[in-house]
């Protein structure tokens, strides 16, 4: 059974709503999204776009996760001096063997088995082959799915996304401070607009909000839109609701990579 979340409700409602000609998403604050969340949102945006609804993405900066989601929009705009940081998945670990040796600290590792990399940073000076194998086994399939979604959304091939990620710095160009020009020329984005230019673009397409104190376009936030949804969207009957939590379960509020206990009741 397909999951039913708030995003699914908004998508189904906006598709059928003739008063909503387009959906605009600002991805400037979406670095919180991990791969799983980003992939799920990207698929929902893809379905929304394929339904015929115009989806507009704009941001002054796009990371790997936020570009994955933005790539599913009908059009993707970035600030002329913004950034497009599509660099794939990965990470770095600090290996402190020499540090502990210089500090005369003895590390005793009590572990058994081949794939026991949790303590390697304390007694190795580099990544073990087994650790590399398990990390590649985890990350490569996820990155392949992300590349495929990005490429499909922009009418490109996965190898084009891989090339862009591999040569992130090389695509800056002479005297450039970012790779936006390359992205524009190669259909990774549709183009660039400053904040005033984008505001004017939206006004021309959707009209000016006469009730706003400053010049802006007609829009309604998803929170305000939710208040106007009057359809019966309840799922009655004998259903089991599953609330998913991503990250380490720790005390406190929910944050990036942390499933806060204060909002999770088991």
Role assignments for model-derived ranges:
Residues 11-75:
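Membrane-embedded segments
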Residues 228-263:
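Intrinsic disorder and flexible/low-complexity segments
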Residues 56-116, 193-215:
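Flexible, acidic/glycine-enriched loop-and-adjacent beta/alpha segments
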Residues 25, 70, 135, 183, ...:
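Terminal peptide-recognition signature
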Residues 152-153, 171, 190-239:
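C-terminal long alpha-helix characteristic of the crotonase
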Residues 26-35, 54-60, 82-87, 120-137, ...:
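Second-shell loop/turn segments in exported
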Residues 1-13, 264-265:
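Single conserved hydrophobic/aromatic residue that forms the stacking wall/gate
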Residues 93, 97-203:
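Charged, glycine-interspersed solvent-exposed loop segments at helix/strand-loop junctions
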